[in-house]
């Protein structure tokens, strides 16, 4: 397959339109820059990998989460709420009791390399930056999860199955955990809800603190 055969490689979205309007929000693409065009997703290891959070707006993830947590309660949605040093993507609030709420965060994959690779073979290939994505997401889960725990509020993380599988968290599932992963697949023309996994904040902290310790020990051992 030719690298320049863009239609077979990328789901370009807004960049194929002269007005650069995102197909998921009907607003200007947030991925544009002076040097590179915006991209919604790209094919990596035979799977369409989501790299823009607006891609999730093709589905009603708010309703799915509210059905799980609020079970028929009336609610309102607050978008992009700032609290001290934190930004919450969505805060879902019970209309009848404003102290009853939960938070939704959208997480997509970080990349490294250049989008220009698909237009110019001299550029470094675009690929998934798993380590950076893991670092950013886990730090957010731990920090925001700890904050929300003070209010007995849950944190819902919307993400793609490939990212969740990379974390290997299935074996720490906790039925009433503070963190709820809403996992979607993107292997067909439509993004589909696949499953939810509840996890304890403490178990997540312990899992990744242990991994970090092992990583450091491994680095030290290689230097000896």
List where the protein language model places each region.
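Non-catalytic C-terminal interaction segments of nucleic acid-processing enzymes
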Residues: 1-35, 125, 131-224
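Nuclease-adjacent, charged terminal/linker segments that flank catalytic cores
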Residues: 1-87, 217-224
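General "foldedness" signal
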Residues: 66, 117-120, 167-171
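A cross-family glycoside hydrolase active-site/sugar-binding cleft signature
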Residues: 80, 105, 158
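Short, well-ordered loop/turn elements at secondary-structure boundaries
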Residues: 85-87, 97-99, 150-152
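Conserved catalytic-core segments centered on acid/base and nucleophilic motifs
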Residues: 89-93, 145-148
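Active-site beta-strand-loop-beta-strand hairpin of nuclease catalytic cores
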Residues: 92-117, 121
């Amino acid at each position: 397959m030719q690298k320049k055969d863009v239609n077979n490689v990328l789901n370009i979205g807004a960049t194929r339109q002269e007005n650069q309007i995102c197909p998921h929000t009907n607003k200007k693409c947030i991925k544009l820059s002076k040097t590179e065009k915006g991209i919604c997703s790209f094919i990596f290891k035979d799977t369409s990998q989501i790299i823009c959070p607006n891609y999730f707006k093709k589905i009603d993830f708010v309703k799915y989460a509210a059905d799980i947590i609020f079970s028929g309660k009336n609610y309102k949605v607050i978008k992009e709420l700032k609290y001290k040093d934190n930004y919450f993507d969505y805060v879902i609030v019970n209309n009848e009791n404003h102290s009853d709420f939960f938070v939704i965060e959208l997480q997509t994959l970080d990349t490294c390399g250049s989008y220009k690779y698909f237009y110019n073979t001299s550029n470094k290939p675009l690929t998934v930056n798993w380590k950076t994505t893991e670092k950013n997401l886990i730090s957010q889960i731990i920090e925001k999860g700890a904050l929300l725990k003070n209010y007995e509020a849950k944190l819902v993380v919307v993400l793609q199955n490939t990212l969740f599988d990379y974390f290997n968290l299935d074996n720490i599932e906790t039925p009433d955990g503070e963190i709820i992963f809403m996992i979607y697949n993107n292997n067909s023309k439509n993004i589909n809800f696949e499953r939810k996994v509840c996890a304890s904040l403490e178990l997540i902290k312990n899992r990744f603190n242990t991994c970090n310790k092992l990583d450091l020990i491994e680095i030290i051992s290689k230097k000896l």
